[in-house]
Amino acid sequence: VPLPTVEGSPGTVPSTVREEEDGYVLYGRGATDMKGGVAVQLKLAAELTAQDTDYNLTYIFYDNEEVASELSGLARLIRNHGELITDADFGVLLEPTNGTIEGGCNGTMRFFVRTRGLAAHSGRAWRGENAIHALAPALAALASYEPKTIAVEGLDYREGLNAVQISGGVAGNVIPDAAAMHVNYRFAPDKTLDEAISHVREVFAGYDLDFVDLSPAARPGLDTPLATSLIEAVGEEPQPKYGWTDVARLSEI
């Protein structure tokens, strides 16, 4: 289970140190994601260690889940102590899911669509080439794009292709000579990473794409005996995981 880290989800979760305790209940930032998962594993470790079980269980706690991939604690563990994981038959990542099972996960990639122009004074704009204007066809492609819902092993994964940032320009009287649009693509686990890259290159044909994050999807894999027994114990229909999680790292082993 990922340990709570300071850098997780920058810009989406307000920073605060305020927390409240009410008996066994903790309220505060990170209480659900991921202190809740940590607490569940610690409780299970304490209780199941004192019992006879049919399974050999390994509990893994790691840092840096939601930051740069090269900092991932799970990736570091796989590199340095892969024997703890590579022999596993089944893995559960304790993301907050409202008590249901979410199988696999969508893949994600981030990239910049970059344009170049020619700087000029805006009073003599005809002497320049506006790099921001050159992004217009790329924005139009996004506005008309229809994301798919794709069934994979009985679960419906919703895809998404969205601009998340745009940057360009240096001053209010200068025609910009460079611009960039930051795009996020969430793709279903029916695609490999290479297939997803080929798709966005087709959507943005003619543009330079600068990829900054490439994370593969993971298929559900809920048809194994261990998975089906867990589904029966939970008693709820499994759902797809729309976001990306470290389940994808486990599925690559």
Model-based region annotation:
Residues 1-29, 49-54:
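Acidic/His- and Gly-rich active-site-bordering loop/insert found
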Residues 7, 96, 101-104, 110-253:
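Metal-dependent amide/peptide-bond hydrolase catalytic core
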Residues 12-17, 44, 76-78, 109-111:
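Glycine-rich, phosphate-binding/catalytic loops in enzymes
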Residues 21, 32-35, 126, 221:
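Residues at secondary-structure transition points
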Residues 22-33, 235-240:
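Short pre-catalytic strand/loop immediately N-terminal to key active-site residues, enriched for Gly-Thr
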Residues 28-32, 63-68, 120-129:
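Flexible, glycine/proline-enriched loop segments at strand-loop-helix junctions
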Residues 35-106:
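Acidic/histidine-rich catalytic neighborhood of metal-dependent amide-processing enzymes
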